[in-house]
Amino acid sequence: MMLSIIGSFATSPAEAAPSNYKFDFGNGQVEKGYIGVSADEKYDEKKRYGFNTPENMINVPASGTGVGSDAVEFLKFSTKSENTFNVDLPKGLYEVKVTLGDTARASVAAEGVYQVINMTGNNATDSFQIPVTDGQLNLLITEGKVGTRFTLSALEIDKLSHHPETNRTIYIGGDSTVCNYYPIDSSIQAGWGQLLPKFVDSEIFQVRNMASGGQIARGFLYDGQMEAILKYIKPGDYYILQLGINDTNPKNTTTEAQFKEYMREMVQQVKAKGATPILSTPQGRATDFNTEGVHSSVNRWYRNSVIALAQEENVPLVDLNVLSSAYFTSIGPAATLALYMNGDTLHPNRAGATELARIVAEELKRQGLDGFTGEEKKNQ
């Protein structure tokens, strides 16, 4: 078995741990440069890594190649589960890259909160920054979609800084028109939060998109996504929040007054952390054109309550509903429809999500918020 451990060593046990790792999970062939980890490998202080409760892990095949050809499955899970993969790490800020096995939809949790929401598809890959302050990273794969497998094929850990604090961050809350789709760099369907990094100065900000499909304000507030944001958000960070599409669905039994108060609670929680909340109104449907060729959807998605809340709480507002309608009117019905998924007038495709992200970034730049660019970065 080949090991790849790169790191600096210090005198204390915690600081003696390597600060860079590459793990290949499962019982198949171990890829060159990776540490092979089987499901039955219990955490060991000498190795400094392993599963906390290997009796709740199994090895499983995966349909990919290389590190994606096998995986481990987490039989017990939740953000608070103790069924974690543990790695000793010196205090600092780390970049963690996760590759799933065969999974319909799964999330990544670490340090007791969500880190990545709803990765989809076999061998989906994503990464995140995480501060480690207690000498150990504790990570697992969790829901996701109930009744499906939660698997992990590979994990790469790289130390970014000795200081355990995330870079300035733009956090995003939202629904299926905002969230990430996978493969994240080439998905046909996309949310505008997924494409926003193209219009953000990466030397100033990282973007953490915590949006998820089907989400409502009550769910985002109480089901773990807001908890994850509040764990890390700090002065200098932004929190862009766009919800309302699913809240207006009768099956979710959310009145407009309730929606507004859930949104207010999130705004106030972010303010209390010293960060800047930003509200956004959802764009309309592709077909919201009148007979004169004007696109308008101002009465959709509890928009008026979002505008009123922004005024009451004195926070920035992106009226994406109106701004996107102006853009759609300028390009016409046919070109607008081409920015949405085939047969779907609600969800943007990658080109549509890119245009919505551009509109959001341009408006925030116009309002004087730093970190937003007016031009798309082609290398992202």
List where the protein language model places each region:
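Short, structured coil segments at secondary-structure junctions
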Residues: 110-112, 203, 273, 313
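Serine-esterase "nucleophile elbow" of acetyl-processing enzymes
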Residues: 25, 139, 158-211, 226-239
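Compositionally biased, intrinsically disordered or flexible polar/acidic segments
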Residues: 17-183
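Alpha-helical cap/lid subdomain in secreted, periplasmic
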Residues: 225-350, 354, 358-369, 373-376
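Structural motif
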Residues: 215-224
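A recurrent domain-boundary module in secreted/ectodomain proteins
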Residues: 145-161, 359-380
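Sec-dependent signal peptide cleavage junction
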Residues: 5-18
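Conserved beta-strand scaffold positions in the cores of enzyme catalytic domains, especially
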Residues: 22, 207-209, 314-317
